[in-house]
Amino acid sequence: ILLPFFWLPEDTLELRCHRDHVLYDVWQKQGFIQTTEGNVIHYGFIEKFIERLGETYNIREIAYDRWNATQMVQNLEDMGFTMVPFGQGFKDMSPPSKELFKLLMEGNILHGGNPVLKWMAGNVVMRQDPAGNHGTGPLHPQRNRQRQCL
């Protein structure tokens, strides 16, 4: 069972809807996206949210992308959470990507019909490096290599 949470800055919600052609505002009204005050993500809001989740759920560890996460990692560690760095390359992404694919194929992923998660999943493609490691990334049109050389 997946219990996802998503945040966007309140002041940029309308702009993002028009720019991305995505129903963020509808999802926010339906409770699938939470907004934070201002025009950038308010990390303090998210940290407090995670702290409250920790009162309800037994959160064993939180995986995070190392890029630009130092302050949030320190704050969550101060709250007692175990923080685990998690890279975004094939080395770290391969084992969980394979497991996710397996669970999806077996029909063992339940997300309660969350439209945000469904939209995000529809914009991800599984990739494989020359060593056979799998990873995920955003869905982009695949360019023809011969065309790039012209």
Which role fits each region the language model picked out?
Residues 1-3, 149-150:
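Acidic, metal-ligating active-site segments
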Residues 2-61:
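Nucleic-acid-processing active sites and adjacent nucleic-acid-binding tracks
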Residues 8-12, 67-69, 144-145:
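Short, glycine-/Ser/Thr-/acidic-enriched flexible segments
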Residues 23-29, 75-150:
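Metal-dependent DNA phosphodiester-chemistry modules and their immediately adjacent helices/loops
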Residues 45, 64-68, 92:
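Short, glycine/acidic-rich beta->alpha junctions
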Residues 56-73:
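Short glycine-rich phosphate-binding loop at a beta-alpha junction
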